[in-house]
Amino acid sequence: ARAVGIDLGTTNAVVAVLEG
């Protein structure tokens, strides 16, 4: 569960950067 949370958090951060 923790690993999944980290993966989701990383994905959200990347998406935020791509969206600007």
Curated annotation (Swiss-Prot):
Keywords: ATP-binding, Chaperone, Nucleotide-binding, Stress response. One of its GO terms (molecular function) is ATP binding. Induction: By stress conditions e.g. heat shock. It comes from the Bacteria. Belongs to the heat shock protein 70 family. Acts as a chaperone. This is Chaperone protein DnaK. It comes from Mycobacterium avium.
